[in-house]
Design a protein with these regions (language model features):
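Gly/Ser-rich catalytic/binding loops embedded in alpha/beta enzyme cores
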Residues: 22-260, 362-363
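Gly/Ser-rich, acidic/histidine-flanked active-site/gating loops
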Residues: 88-92, 124, 160, 172-175, ...
Length: 542
């Protein structure tokens, strides 16, 4: 037998991996032709693609007949805030309040920036939430905003507001390593589109927040990012540093990304308010691509209103993002919620839900809203995750084929290196069939929101986390209470004392129809006011 020749036994082994079975005659018939397929694949692999090269196929969450609203505008509360004397109170204040203080000259952008830089210096060792702190740049940008303020010039609600940026976004001449060892010392030549938009709005860059390596989990080349409410556990990810820094009062707000839970999961863990916009609403130009048909960008804040304010700045079409969609954004924080139809899936509040989850239904009923039990079509939603694995493995094919993935810190079974390797055995035929299943999921989600305005539920119970990410629907996640839980971990070697418990946040996810973020924001505002717990802070910061 010639070395390298495909044999019948090779095909039999492959059948086991793919979960299929051929006859002896079928195996013999395909044996020689398989070698041509292998040669073709190897030839293609000689072509190396930069991470910013997109796919030819283009995901669009809109089904035929979709009508885009043409409403646009931003109206937030016009409260007058008095600047407190405590640096901690200033640090944990909302973006809206801080913006008012700067505009009315109760505080300078430089002073606000210095407060955060001091807190980063004090608490970074505990939280490990920043990959890179841009001290000189932050102070220079703050001083520039103060000069404008002195001349009564304001660039808008983010004028002089310091923020953290997930280390997936290119920043000119500032290391952007994607949390991964192979990309350390990577210096982009230009800024990502979102950086340009935030700078034009007057926001001040404090630094690059830590990201789980290649946008997964909370483990990166600098260690593990921690949850401010329990420093023994990770912050979850992959927007690990963005959620941790925001929850810990180490920035006014932060920018995160989500492919499958990377805004909502750390927001759940750290008690922040995270907004995952509709797919295509926010430009990803200059952001690391993990999954072209799934990646989304959104704000992580300490209040609902702030997320809407920031989305109004970063929203907008960008011709440099092949998947970008022209979509106006309208947000009036004073808009009434009386006519909202709120849906819930009963099974999501069943045996796997916490008592706090179930109590939320009573609280929503007390708001006087139309609460309806609904059902999502019975489809194999979890199967869609193989689309994510295939796209992610394609994004970082070179790491797998060169064995550089061995240099990544996290090497457990569920970590990227193993997932990338396994993905090489996914069937292209199954991948196409998954794309067809995805279309059915899009239709199921569209049908769901024909009858309701918003859907509520625990983010980690039921099919909605997967279904909504693959359909492109928006989600707001906010804190609704606290639980007493032992330390949570995904590290198999880590030993945990199950008897030692900590007060940690519990959140709720609020999903909406495509491009209708205003409805979930207004509902979130009403719920936030009813619960009155948004101002509670982690004890480590006192």
């Amino acid at each position: 037998m010639n070395k390298g020749k495909i044999t019948v036994s090779d095909i039999v082994s492959a059948e086991k991996i793919l979960g299929i079975e051929y006859s002896k005659q079928e195996r013999e018939q395909m044996m020689n032709d398989l070698e041509d397929q292998i040669i073709s694949a190897k030839t293609r692999r000689k072509s190396k693609f930069d991470n910013n090269v997109p796919t030819a196929s283009k995901f669009d969450p809109r089904l035929p007949g979709f009508e885009m609203s043409n409403l646009t505008g931003l109206k937030i509360s016009e409260k007058t805030y008095k600047c407190p004397s405590s640096d901690e109170d200033i640090a944990f204040a909302s973006v809206a309040a801080q913006g008012h203080w700067i505009k009315t000259k109760q505080i300078t952008s430089r002073r606000l920036t210095e407060i955060y830089l001091d807190r980063i210096n004090k608490f970074q060792g505990q939280l490990n939430c920043y990959a890179n702190v841009t001290v000189e740049l932050a102070l220079a940008e703050a001083d520039a905003m103060d000069l404008l303020t002195e001349d009564y010039i304001s660039l808008g609600p983010l004028h002089g507001i310091p923020y953290g940026l997930k280390d997936l976004f290119d920043t000119k001449d500032i290391e952007t390593a994607w949390g991964a060892e192979p990309y350390k010392n990577r210096l982009p030549l230009k800024d990502a589109e979102i950086v340009k938009r935030l700078r034009a709005a007057g926001a001040v860059l404090l630094g690059k927040t830590a990201v789980g390596a290649l946008a997964y989990n909370d483990i990166w080349y600098g260690g593990r990012t921690k949850n401010p409410w329990n420093l023994n556990e990770g912050s979850s990810g992959s927007s690990a540093g963005s959620a941790s820094a925001t929850a810990g009062g180490l920035c006014s707000f932060a920018i995160g990304t989500e492919t499958l839970g990377s805004i909502t999961s750390p927001s759940e863990r750290c008690g922040t308010t995270g907004l995952r916009p509709t797919f295509g609403r926010v430009s990803r130009s200059g952001c690391m691509a993990l999954c072209w048909s799934l990646d989304k960008i959104g704000p992580i804040c300490r209040s609902v209103e702030d997320t809407g304010l920031i989305l109004s700045i970063i929203n907008g079409y960008d011709e440099n993002d092949r998947f970008s969609i022209k979509a106006p954004f309208n947000f009036n924080s004073a808009k009434a919620t009386d006519d909202l139809k709120v849906g819930y899936i009963p099974d999501a509040f069943g045996a796997d839900a916490t008592e706090l989850d179930k109590d939320i239904l009573r609280i929503v009923s007390n708001l006087g809203l139309d609460l309806q039990a609904v059902a999502l079509d019975n489809l194999p939603y979890s199967s869609l995750i193989n689309i994510l694995h295939a796209e992610a493995a394609a994004s970082f094919e070179d790491l797998t084929l060169s064995n550089e993935d061995d240099n990544l810190t996290w090497q457990d079974n569920e970590a990227w290196p193993n997932s990338f390797r396994k993905a090489r055995f996914l069937s292209a035929v199954d991948h196409v069939q998954l794309d067809r299943l995805r279309y059915l999921v899009m239709k199921a989600m569209d049908d769901l929101f024909n009858d309701i305005d918003i859907l509520i539920g625990p983010f980690d119970v039921g099919p909605m986390l997967v279904a909504s990410n693959f359909s492109g629907h928006p989600c707001l996640h906010l804190r609704v209470g606290f639980e007493s839980l032992p330390t949570r971990t995904r590290i198999k070697s880590e030993k945990i004392d199950p008897k030692k418990k900590f007060k940690v946040p519990r959140g709720l996810s609020i999903w909406g129809a495509l491009f209708e973020e205003e409805k979930i924001l207004n509902f979130g505002l009403a719920l936030e006011a009813q619960l009155n717990i948004a101002d509670q802070r982690p004890t480590f910061a006192r």
